[in-house]
């Protein structure tokens, strides 16, 4: 009888730490695995820029979202060039430049807010007015994003949503 009690006690002692560990939930559907996060942002537009259209269709293939997104190495929708008036800022980097790190090695979890003002890790941002509709499905208190410099629009960065595979133009507001 003592042997059974000893085995049960030992099993309990060994099992308790396993139950105390936090288990991550399953990846939300539509999420991109970490290795599909783009290694770098888009290249500057060198070809004839795509004209700005009020109701542009970004769904380049069946099943792709109708918002700017990344398909492999292609930044679908980042093709309007440097003269796109929607992304003109009179005083680029008025709040300083973001120095927290760019690309797949720097994944940030959103801490709250919304398109008008959101934050992560003590840094504050806002979404470009032209892009607010593109972040409709973002979870502002939990989604992971990656920041990239925008090579065509001074003062703007691109925030890539890891879960959705989509991106929007964002402005750094400082700490």
Residue positions per predicted region:
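Extracytoplasmic low-complexity, disordered linker/stalk tracts in cell-surface/secreted proteins
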Residues: 1-87
């Amino acid at each position: 009888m003592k042997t059974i009690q000893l085995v049960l006690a030992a099993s309990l002692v060994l099992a308790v730490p396993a139950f105390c560990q936090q288990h991550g939930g399953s990846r939300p559907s539509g999420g991109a695995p970490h290795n599909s996060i783009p290694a770098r942002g888009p290249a500057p537009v060198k070809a004839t820029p795509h004209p700005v259209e009020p109701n542009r269709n970004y769904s380049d293939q069946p099943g792709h979202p109708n918002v700017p997104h990344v398909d492999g190495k292609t930044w679908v929708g980042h093709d309007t060039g440097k003269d796109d008036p929607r992304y003109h800022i009179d005083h680029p980097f008025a709040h300083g430049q973001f120095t927290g790190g760019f690309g797949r090695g720097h994944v940030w979890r959103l801490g709250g807010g919304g398109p008008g003002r959101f934050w992560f890790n003590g840094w504050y941002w806002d979404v470009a007015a032209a892009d607010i509709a593109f972040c409709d499905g973002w979870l502002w208190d939990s989604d992971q994003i990656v920041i990239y410099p925008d090579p065509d629009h001074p003062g703007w960065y691109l925030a890539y949503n890891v879960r959705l595979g989509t991106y929007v133009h964002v402005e750094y507001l400082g700490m």
